[in-house]
A protein has these predicted regions:
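Internal, well-ordered domain-core segments that constitute the primary functional module
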Residues: 166-232
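Short catalytic/ligand-binding loop motif for oxyanion handling, primarily in non-cytosolic enzymes
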Residues: 154-155, 197-198, 404
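Contiguous, well-ordered alpha-helical segments that form the cores/surfaces of helical PPI scaffolds
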Residues: 88-92, 138-150, 196-208, 224
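N-terminal hydrophobic signal/anchor transmembrane helix of membrane proteins
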Residues: 145-167, 251-262
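Extended amphipathic alpha-helical segments with heptad-repeat/coiled-coil character used for oligomerization
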Residues: 203, 212-286
């Protein structure tokens, strides 16, 4: 199945999943694993849910694999990380297929696992799983809400609460989570995987929640997530800035979870594997609003999207999310500001006894105390994981996309935050990082995330990325460029510039410090492609361009045949154009924008005009003009209008 494959009809997508499974799926319990394997790991039950949905529609499929359901139950019973990812499928199986496609013995096993599960941190039992990141929160809250609703009079043995009490407990957490997302968007911004996990937590609620406003609000939050995909995708992929990123998604876009969802909803994307989220959207009959579908159409000209998500801890009280109120602590844990000076007192209360997070929080607490006693200054927002206020700039044309998190936490240690990406389509993605490891499974690592976050800014088709790495990081005093030459139709190097063309899209990259091409690394291909790595490795050219030095400037300028004429004309435009100065005081003579100035502590100016890079609206694009923390989002595209009124819990689609 190639990247050009497009699917919109729900049953058609489910049939496609089943056809893939006929080739890829295990047929015996011995072939199953505990890994994140779409068909054969603990999430393989989504393949069997797809079969149940088709059988319900009168379409023949291979037999249901009860052993795949058992694999999910094993993870739930052991309370392992990501067990919550399996529960949406189990709830739908019980609600829609019990007594027909789900036999009674299997249904009772599912019930017992769900009734004995640990649904939140305040319940007894060791914590072996992550409950508290933004996506895990909604998965746990929706699971507790719906399972409690299904079994109101049953006593759940783990903490002795009845199902009705669990439902009430979850409702308070759920309503807070919904309110935060409606007002501030998603801290894990534009994630290729976690957006789908958010939808996974919301999709059953939009059908089964016993409170009408929650059903509507969950549907509208799915709409909002889908709108983010609509205005930021390129050819059905999401090569943008990201709040959290993984190597396999940015290097190999066909692995993106979001691509199958866009294939299902937009007739865009890649449907060569199974997406749990897409299966659930198809099974629950989610219909994308007309205006969002129109906005998702490929741009015929230049489209610019500015948007803002999340808030800084220092601003939270202004927005009514007081860090001193323990009821708000999960907002800050969702954006991963566990150890901020304003949150740390309440963070200590989350795990009063030892947990893997306890060491980190207690260590920072002691640091604050010692510095205060000594009267010494101290960084009050130290979390390398933090996903605070982000101002996103994305430019899309028919031939390329360029996207940036404007001046995001410059100089701070990073985690999985991905400040910028350019793409000419498919695997022809371009970005830089300050690596934190030569391994590919660490966070951050060689390509996913940054040891030190840069100061990156974008204006239209030009991006400037400044790195200043602390001297203490002696092994990683460099930055490097991912530029897959084998994915380009042409690559030319001259006068310090690296030029690439794919189709009618062009890219130019310049490093202020001299660089060199590093030999391709077989370890990366083994990490990404498993059995087929050798074939991919043999086809690849060198892709890593390294610039040694703790302080460097990268300049990226995009173009196209429509904007610049021929590729030769695009390259000729850079003749004699200089990049002068350093990370503190930079002057770039852009062929398209004229003189651009910038620096580590200087504003961005273009043609002498200071460019705003902070304080964006919630949405600022041709389809939506929405102030930050507004109560509603109005989207107009293709003669259609969608209004997501969160304050009234009303959804309009005309």
């Amino acid at each position: 199945v190639g990247s050009e494959m497009c699917i919109r009809d729900s049953l058609k997508y489910l049939e496609h999943v089943v056809e893939l499974g006929k080739v890829q799926a295990a047929t015996t319990p011995e072939e199953m694993s505990g890994a994140f394997d779409a068909f054969n790991g603990f999430l393989g039950l989504y393949y069997d849910l797809a079969k149940m949905e088709l059988q319900k529609a009168g379409i023949d499929t291979p037999p249901i694999r009860n052993f795949a359901i058992d694999k999910a139950l094993e993870r739930i019973d052991a309370r392992l990380d990501c067990a919550d990812f399996t529960i949406p499928a189990l709830i739908r199986m019980l609600r829609e297929h019990r007594g027909t496609r789900l036999n009674e013995e299997q249904a009772q096993k599912i019930e017992q696992s769900l009734i004995h599960f640990k649904y939140w941190l305040d319940e007894p039992g060791d914590v072996h799983a992550c409950f508290f990141t933004e996506n895990h929160q909604i998965l746990y809250h929706s699971a507790e809400y719906l399972v409690g609703q299904m079994y109101p009079d049953v006593v759940f043995p783990n903490n002795g609460m009845t199902g009705a009490e669990h439902h009430a407990h979850a409702t308070a957490f759920l309503r807070r989570w919904l309110n935060w997302r409606e007002r501030f968007g998603f801290s894990e911004w534009l994630t290729q995987g976690y957006y789908m996990d958010d939808m996974l937590g919301l999709v059953n609620l939009m059908i089964y929640a016993d409170e009408a406003d929650i059903r509507t609000r969950c549907r509208m939050l799915i709409d909002m997530l889908v709108f983010d995909l609509a205005v930021n995708h390129f050819e059905g992929h999401l090569p943008t800035t990201h709040g959290r990123v993984y190597t396999r998604f940015i290097i190999e876009p066909d692995y993106e979870d979001c691509s199958a969802v866009m294939a299902l909803l937009f007739d865009k994307g890649y449907a060569g594997t199974m997406s749990n989220c897409a299966v659930m959207l198809a099974a629950n009959g989610y219909v994308c609003p007309k205006a969002i579908l129109a906005a998702a159409a490929a741009p015929t000209g230049i489209q610019t999207n500015r948007e803002r998500m999340s808030i800084d801890v220092a601003d939270a009280k202004y927005y009514g999310v007081d860090p001193a109120d323990f009821d708000n602590i999960m907002f800050f844990w969702g954006q991963q500001t566990y150890s901020d000076r304003l949150t740390i007192e309440n963070s200590l209360k989350v795990f009063p006894t030892w947990n893997w997070m306890t060491n980190r929080v207690r260590a920072y607490y002691e640091r604050y105390k010692l510095h205060d006693e000594a009267g010494a200054p101290c960084v009050d927002a130290p979390d390398f994981t933090a996903m605070t206020q982000v101002d996103i700039y994305t430019r899309r044309t028919p031939d390329y996309i360029l996207s940036c998190a404007q001046d995001f936490r410059k100089g701070r240690m990073g985690y999985q935050q991905h400040p910028w990406t350019a793409s000419l389509g498919g695997k022809a993605v371009i970005f830089t990082t300050n690596p934190a490891s030569t391994e590919y499974s660490n966070r951050p690592n060689c390509w996913a995330g940054n040891l030190t976050l840069p100061r990156a800014v974008q204006h239209e088709n030009v991006l400037l990325c400044l790195y200043r790495v602390e001297p203490d990081f002696v092994d990683y005093l460099y930055s490097h460029l991912y530029f897959p030459r084998h994915e380009m139709d042409e690559v030319v190097e001259k006068e310090g510039w690296i030029f690439g063309r794919k189709g009618d899209g062009y890219a130019a990259v310049y490093s202020l410090l001299p660089g060199y091409w590093e030999k391709k690394d077989p370890a990366m291909f083994k990490e990404l492609y498993a059995e087929s790595w050798q074939e991919k490795y043999d086809r690849a050219d060198d892709y890593e361009y390294i610039a040694q030095g703790h302080a460097n400037v990268w300049v990226i300028e995009m173009g196209s045949k429509a904007e610049n004429g021929s590729f030769e004309a695009f390259m000729d435009g850079f003749a004699g154009k200089k990049v002068c100065g350093d990370t503190h005081n930079l002057i770039y003579q852009s062929p398209s924008q004229g003189e651009i100035t910038f620096g580590w502590n200087r504003p961005l100016t273009v043609g002498g005009e200071t460019i705003c890079i902070h304080g964006y609206k919630r949405y600022d694009n041709e389809f939506a003009q929405t102030e930050f923390d507004a109560g509603a989002i109005e989207i107009n595209a293709g003669g259609h209008q969608t209004i997501l009124d969160f304050e009234k819990a009303e959804r309009t689609d005309i």
